Regions:
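Positively charged n-region of N-terminal signal peptides that target proteins for export
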Residues: 1-4
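Secreted/extracellular ectodomain signature
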Residues: 20-141
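Bacterial N-terminal signal peptides
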Residues: 6-16
Length: 141
């Protein structure tokens, strides 16, 4: 009995330690690049500055995909080059995903997007699955 108690206690302590060291997981949802991209990229940079181990996925759809297109710049401040900001965050482990339904609806091609962009069949489904199945927190800048 003493061995069983020791084993259970050791397992509980191990699980507790594992839970404390697990990285946070967050999905940033962007569906309007003009309103959310610059603020969202700044939020992500700050997020990683404070918690660098955080796993971050940026899911875009509708007008949110625009900042991931080749040569995209902030419409309010053309000095802000999205490509450089996205590449810097990608180098820190951030994933950027573009909705393929949006591509079809807007007659866009994958080749029009930054090499840092990945593609997902549905942005909305991807956000839901990251939250429900993979335990990601949700942020909409």
């Amino acid at each position: 009995m003493k061995t069983l108690t020791t084993l259970i206690l050791g397992l509980a302590l191990g699980l507790s330690a594992a839970a404390q060291t697990a990285a946070d997981k967050v999905v940033y949802h962007i569906d309007n690049a003009a309103m959310q991209a610059t603020k969202g990229l700044r939020n992500i940079r700050n997020h990683l500055d404070v918690a660098p181990e955080t796993q971050i996925v940026v899911v875009t759809h509708a007008d949110g995909v625009d900042f991931l297109m080749e040569g995209a710049k902030d419409k309010n401040n053309p000095n802000i080059d999205y490509g450089a900001l996205v590449s810097a965050l990608k180098a820190r482990g951030v994933r950027f995903e573009v909705c393929e339904i949006t591509l079809k609806n807007r007659n866009l091609q994958k080749g029009q997007f930054s090499m840092d962009a990945e593609f997902t069949p549905s942005g909305v489904v991807r956000v839901g699955r990251l939250q429900a199945r993979e335990g990601y927190g949700y942020i909409k800048p």
